[in-house]
Structure formats: structure tokens, C-alpha cells
Amino acid sequence: MRALAIIASIALGVPVDEKDDLEQLLANGKAALRAGKIDEAASAANQAVQRAPKDARGYFLRGLVRGAARKSTEAGADFGKCIELDPKLADAYQQRGGEYFKLAKIDESLADFDKFLELRPDERPGHWQRGIALYYAGKYKEGAEQFKAGDKVFADDVENAVWHYLCNAKVVGADKARAELLKIGTDKRVPMMVVYDLFAGKAKPEDVMAAVEKGKPKESEMKSRQFYANLYLGLYYDSTGDKKKAREHLEKAGADPNVGGYMGDVARVHLSILRP
């Protein structure tokens, strides 16, 4: 978990005699968060903040914990405190941008992602979260450019190609966007290659669901398959103007907050925009 590694790199701002206790609290909190022990991680993070209120690491850890607990407003405030303490802390902008997105605060999310890239320009080609934020901000041309750049990073990722299509279709129309669909290698996740064919005009929605049912996947694999199928069928139907079917699939995709990670949040944000 890259975000946890960031904590170790933030400069200390505590007296020497408190350093060992603080280091232990941060280590305990990171370990608990990795293990999914949210309450234990929250306790360690709160103690770290109390022990060293001018050290950004405690707030960063607590922001991660609150984000994991789906407390995006509180998480965003913690990352904001990190930025107040260290305006050059790029990863705090990245994390806060993600929390803003979950709250459907698209403009604020995009501003933070842009600030992150101002500080870390080398990350620009692979910043797919920014591309998605651009889509929801209505900046479709910029979004298409972001995902086009991502083609060099995600050569085997159907999602990058689909999001390029979704942005590009808003600019040049569906037919031309389909003709300009980014070429990819092989995305091994089921049913992503069928999803690719769907947006390429070579498959039907029922083909995507049929792919989900193939074989005898374990429960966790089946949940993943169903999630991606419902997410991209929802986005597909929305792109064709069928809001009813889009809602049906996006409701299924966003139903379980423990499935889909950030893309689950995308499903929920999109659904919130579709609802009257």
C-alpha cells in the first residue's frame, strides 16, 4: 500500500524524547490498517496526532484510516491539515483528491490531482483518476488526452481504453470514437475483453454477462466479475442514452462498498449524477 509508505518519508517535527513513542504509534497504525483493523488503526492515528500535532504523518495516517472507513469528509480534513503543515506534500493532494471525488466534489478533486501533478509531473501519463475526474467535470477533450497518454502505461488495460472512448465520444461522436478506440493487448480479468468488444461494436451486453458465468470461479472472483460487468454495462448504457438500464447496472455495481475499490466509488458517483 503505497500511501502507507508515504508516512515514513515525511519529515519529523517532534522532540527527540517523543520520537520513539511516535514511531511506534505510526508503525502500529500502519500495521493495523494493512490488516483491516480499522478501530485499532484509528486509535493509533489519534494518539499520534495528539502526541505530535505539528507532524503531518499522524494526520496522513488518520486520513487513510478515515478514508478506509468511508468517512471522506473527515479524511479530506486530515489531508488538508497535512497540506497546511507541508504544502509540498504531493501525496496529501492525491489522497484528498480521491476523497473529494468520493463526495462527488469533482472540481475540488480535479484541482488536487492537478496540484499533485504539478509537484510530481512524472506521474501524469498514468494518472487515470485525473482522467475520470475530467470526464465528470465535462472536460472531455482533456480527458481523452489523459487516457491517450495512459495508453503507454496501461497497454493491457481495457478500462483505460473504455474511458478514452467515453471521453472521446463526447467530442467526436460515438462512431468516430469507436474507430479511434485504443488498441490493447490482453486484459486477463474476466469479462474485460468482452467489455472491450462491446465498446468496439463487436459484442452485445448479454455477451458480457455470459462471460461472467463461464467456468467455476471462486466467490471473490465472481463478485469481481459481476462488479466490472455491471459497472461497464452501466457506463455503456448511459453512453447510448438508456438511463434506465444504466441505473440498474450501476446500482448493482455500487451496492457493496467492499467490492471494486476506487471504481466502486466511480459507480456510486455516476449513479448519483444519473438520479433526478
PLM regions: where:
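Position-specific recognition of the canonical hydrophobic site in helix A of tetratricopeptide repeat
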Residues: 33, 60, 67, 94, ...
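Structural marker of alpha-solenoid helical repeat scaffolds
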Residues: 51, 85, 119, 153-154, ...
